[in-house]
Amino acid sequence: MTKGFASSGLVVVILAGNLAVIAAADETHIHRNGFAGREPFWIRGDANIRFEEKRHKISDEHARNAPTSELVAIEAHPPGGATEAEFVHYYYPIPPAPVSPRLHAGVWVKAYRAGVELRARLVLPKERDPQNPEAPLTTLLIGDKYRNVRYWEPLSLGNVPELLRRHLPVLHARLGRAVDPSDAYIDQIILNVYAGPGLTEVWIDDLEVGPVLPGSVPRPSASVATPVKNGSGSDDRPPPATKSVRFVEGQIQIDGEKFFMLGIRHSDTPLKTLRDANLNTVWFPADASPDTIEDAARQGFWIVPTLPVLEVPDNRGPRESTVSLAAATLAQQLRKYAATDAVLMWNLGGGKTAEDFPAVKRTVEVLNEVRFKQPRAIDIWDGFRSYGSYIDAIGTHRWPLFTSLELHRYKDWLSQRKSLTPANTMTWTWVQTHLPEWYINQVIGQPGAVKFDEPIGPHPEQIRVLTYLSLAAGNRGIGYWSDRFLANSHQGRDRLLELALLNTEIEMLKPLLLSANDPAKWLGTSHPNVHAAVIRSENELLVLPVWLGPGTQYTPASAAIANLRITVPLVPDAAIPWLVTPAGVTELKGWRRVAGGTEITLPEFDLAAAIVFTSDLKLDGKIVRWQDHTRYRVGELAAQWARQQAIEQYNKALLTHQKIIAAGGPELPETGSLLARARESIDRSREFFENRQWDMAYREARRAQRPIRVLMRADWEKAIQPLDFPSASPYAVSFYALPKHWEFAREVASSQPEESVLDYGQFELSREAPTEGAAISSLPGWSTRQSILRQDPVIAQAGIVNSQGLADAEPQPRIQLTGRYAPLHVMAPSPDQVDKPRPVLGSHCLKLEIRPRVACNPRGQPTGRPQALERSFLAVDSPRVELPPGTLVRISFWAKVPQPIEASADGVVVYDSVGGEPLSARIDQTRGWQIFHMYRRIPAAGDISLTFALTGIGTAYFDDVRIEPLRQAVNPRLSSSGDRGAPQLPAESSTRLRYPRTVPSSSGP
């Protein structure tokens, strides 16, 4: 058996650090704080020396996990002859934590001098305080002392019952009698921050105490209690100020500082886990509870509440009373957020179109009336100009993963949406982290599933590529769609780790992303599948090379390239290239000036990278700050996260590969060596980590995932070899669905097609079509539809046209020279010329065309062709075909797209009613006539139909469309191999299943 790595089965567990939510019985009674709020939580307590509080705030200078920690900085002035009894206490109130063997109390501390000590206040409720008989007796328990200077170190109380047992004789001696310790509990965690004369700075993070009794969670110190008077006099800190949120020139500004949104839609993942993943914004549904909202604000999140959109009265009569009621409901909804200053913007919904604009406009007007001035945001599909006049932030999104939309086309789509957005409007996009409903229903076959027992996608690598493309498109915010698919219930540990790593990188790159002057420019590189986005800011450049190879949306390739070369134009003088990762920042050596710019060589490219050209090399400059940041703050975590992710990826890939083999997939001879290479890199990563070499540990963990991707990609490529395109089989769109694909393929391969049951799929008319084409309705059951916004200057037309002149040119015979001019070597004809099937066209075929409408500017001059269309959709629908549920069918059609489709990332789309648009055949251009096949199973509804659609400027032709039922003709011979006990195809067909294919008939269609 191939060796695997053990992994925990907790709910959302990241063993690499405090990205953990423990699924224990008393999980709800563990009190945690990551100190990610806006005001300090620790309260200044008593002291026996004079000191001054220099700083006390939530700080982003150092943090063990989340972006912030709490900083306490004091300057102590002890008297002469001081002993070790001096103290300056800061305390943190907690719900009562009863003393028991299970009680644990600890906190992480970092300082530049040793001596900070953890303590706790113990309450003995059965005893009275002699100096205050109305209060219970309290005493201090002493825990660990900080020693590991400049590094984060956990301080713990240790065995609390043992501490109490040892302390009882002291209390007995002090009181002169025995003490009853029953029902004792801890109610305060205390830090003695005195570490000697002078300045002491202490950063505090990741407090955890439990089990505790259910109770209220402490508020920040400014609102919890008035600090105790001490040696420094009264507390004169001003009350916390309300933060100002403004959107200026497409940027979010908070108190005048630029802010990059890293958000997520919240469902049920603990907010602490999301904060530890370095997210800073949470999108809440309309029914979010006030307690959850308050908890998010306390965790330091910015909040984006979802508000209902008001109805608009129709033309049939006054409905002002209905609108007034809706406005009152909206006002009531807004009051839920009146007590917090953490609202970043109001969300007015998603997937809106131009037709929804009047209702959104009315809602904005009501928001103005009730004087809620926070910016407004909306996610739209089209109607950019209208929404841009009323909305401060516009989001766009689509789900490219597991569909036929290649990621280089998704890149184009992002750029087109950005170009349609009005200038000075903040933009963001949602990144797909989940499986869409269609995938869960069709591929997995578990509608409404709340848990998945086997590995599922998306791959972390896919999320990384989508995020980099979103950054390159110029978005000032990233939203991750689903927090639920980050949980262990959804096999999401590796995705959660990827989000944490990505957000750590983005936090480092944020100054360059927010100061970009112009949209990114895309460059080619030395590898055709790698494109590099160049983002320019003042005196600096950010270069983002990204792997965009075919099929990445299905299953990522290895995407590892040695010595990738990029020529970057217009690099500022004295700027040096640096490779930036969350575990280290290193200079790229060997760059040189060449014609066209500066050529850099990336020794080890892996899927995506961030390269910064800068001359800011001062001691307090950007590079030094980044190096300190990775060395002392995030590098250790990044290395841990990357190694844990590699282990998770290894185990998921191994399990799925074994299931593929059991389902009849081919053995891969290189499997053993690939898995061995992955294990070796994981082991080396652990060794580097133990030696505190964070950068090397991170790199090895990343290297470990490359052979895993090679294995997954090889399995996927074997599966799709017989297909015209991957989504022709609904189970070939993901590596994790391949076991089902091989079962499906066996059934298809053992079938024979019957006659087509689709009427008029040859598009033949009883008479010759007119020059402009005959109407689609000339064929019974066939229909056409279109949806074109008036903003799109195009004209769409579909019809049945004469096929004369549309046949492919016959290949010209080669002239064979003889004699002295005869070539020494004769080039064999290409497989396309020899094996390419050719259609036998009838008299007519289907034509779809969208062409630009002649338009003029105000000066009467013709405008150019549109570069992006908001919504231009021309479609022809076939008749509905009824078949018994469960019937396998083969769909085939011939298509000819003479020129690339312009102004649309989708091009020509052909899909069936079973697989839908995600599983469509997308065509941008063909070399002559080309045949396409799709294989589907009839659903319970018992019918299927086809749609031929054009989404951009261009022309497409179709002919010989068939829907052929497949009947079982041959039962594959079953044999067992080894000890697997799984049915296998005969050896000659085990590596490539022979799908039944359409063969053109010499007698014509």
Mark where each language-model region is.
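Glycan-processing catalytic domains of CAZymes
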Residues: 109, 196-199, 206, 211-545, ...
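Extracellular carbohydrate recognition and processing domains
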Residues: 131-183, 913-943, 953, 957
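Extracellular carbohydrate recognition
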Residues: 179-185, 194-211, 217-219, 949-968
